[in-house]
């Protein structure tokens, strides 16, 4: 064995030991994030799959962490772990094309109504625009709630037409570029102009990270009604940010 090969073997062994220590130390963090997310995800998602993806996110965090940027490793790792888990869940999005089509129909209807009236589209107006009964409209909202509501990125996607790459809110690097700043401002403005109850649903779901059942208890409505409110809120934001989404 040459000296160079000996150094390489030593370095490899050190890296492996460091990796194992990292996993042992932060495995509880991965587990905690996995179980926290599980309550907000479809029943088909297995916690073991989340934890496996989270471990990959943890290792990626270890490779890319830069202490000079100010965040603690645990904070940075938490973001990467959660992102890796959500990426894994997104891979399993097998919602029928009809669901994505209905999502776009609702978005287009809301946009048309609000362009005509200059105010928030009401439930019965959207149903009438789609030539549906109110009950059938609520059924569509319940169907479209399912697969992609884990982050603001997902909130603004309809399954086939998402955000422009440069405006992705799941980007883990610092906000960059004028386009991104303008989009963030447009999103903040669109959220501020939502009906009060829809704003509250957003805050409880994304900021407080409550699940739909818990939000229903706060609002005094059923879980299915919260699902409808969330889907309608998502469609309203997609309608108001349509120019950004088609950029």
Swiss-Prot record:
Q: Which residues bind DNA?
A: 212-231
| Region Sigma-70 factor domain-4: start-end pairs | 190-238
- Which GO MF terms are attached to this record? DNA binding; DNA-directed RNA polymerase activity; sigma factor activity
Q: Where is this region: Sigma-70 factor domain-2?
A: 22-94
The segment annotated Sigma-70 factor domain-3 runs over 102-171
Function of the protein:
Sigma factors are initiation factors that promote the attachment of RNA polymerase to specific initiation sites and are then released. This sigma factor controls the expression of flagella-related genes. Required for the flagellin gene (fliC) expression.
Compartment(s) of residence: Cytoplasm
- Where does the source fall among the domains of life? Bacteria
The record's NCBIfam families line, in alphabetical order, gives: FliA_WhiG, PRK06986.1, sigma70-ECF
Q: Could you say which protein family the record assigns here? A: Belongs to the sigma-70 factor family. FliA subfamily.
Q: What's the encoding gene here?
A: fliA
Question: Which InterPro entries does the UniProt entry name for this protein?
Answer: RNA_pol_sigma-70_dom (IPR014284), RNA_pol_sigma70 (IPR000943), RNA_pol_sigma70_r2 (IPR007627), RNA_pol_sigma70_r3 (IPR007624), RNA_pol_sigma70_r4 (IPR007630), RNA_pol_sigma_FliA_WhiG (IPR012845), RNA_pol_sigma_r2 (IPR013325), RNA_pol_sigma_r3/r4-like (IPR013324)
Residue window of motif Interaction with polymerase core subunit RpoC = 49-52
Organism listed in the record:
Pseudomonas aeruginosa (strain ATCC 15692 / DSM 22644 / CIP 104116 / JCM 14847 / LMG 12228 / 1C / PRS 101 / PAO1)
**Keyword DNA-binding listed:** yes
Its BP terms in the Gene Ontology are: DNA-templated transcription initiation; positive regulation of cell motility; regulation of DNA-templated transcription
* Keywords of this entry: Cytoplasm, DNA-binding, Sigma factor, Transcription, Transcription regulation
Q: Which GO terms describe its cellular component?
A: cytoplasm
- The name under which this protein is listed is RNA polymerase sigma factor FliA
| The keyword Transcription is assigned to this record | yes
């Amino acid at each position: 064995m040459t000296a160079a090969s000996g150094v390489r073997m030593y370095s490899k062994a050190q890296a492996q030991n460091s990796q194992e220590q990292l996993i042992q130390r932060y495995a509880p963090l991965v587990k905690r994030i996995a179980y926290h997310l599980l309550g907000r995800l479809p029943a088909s998602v297995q916690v073991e799959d989340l934890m496996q993806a989270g471990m990959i996110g943890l290792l990626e965090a270890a490779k890319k962490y830069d202490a000079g940027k100010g965040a603690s490793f645990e904070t940075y790792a938490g973001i990467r772990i959660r992102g890796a888990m959500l990426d894994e869940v997104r891979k399993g999005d097998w919602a029928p094309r009809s669901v994505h089509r209905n999502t776009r129909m609702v978005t287009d209807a809301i946009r048309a109504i609000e362009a005509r009236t200059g105010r928030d589209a009401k439930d019965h107006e959207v149903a009438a625009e789609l030539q549906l009964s109110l009950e059938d409209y609520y059924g569509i909202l319940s169907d479209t709630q399912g697969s992609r509501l884990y982050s603001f990125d997902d909130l603004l996607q309809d399954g086939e037409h998402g955000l422009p790459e440069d405006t992705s809110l799941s980007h883990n690097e610092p906000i960059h570029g004028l386009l991104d700043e303008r989009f963030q401002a447009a999103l903040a403005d669109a959220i501020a102009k939502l009906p009060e109850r829809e704003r509250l649903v957003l805050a409880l779901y994304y900021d407080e990270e409550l699940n739909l059942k818990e939000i229903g208890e706060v609002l005094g409505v059923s879980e299915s009604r919260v699902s409808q409110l969330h889907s309608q809120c998502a469609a309203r934001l997609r309608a108001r940010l349509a120019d950004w989404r088609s950029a």
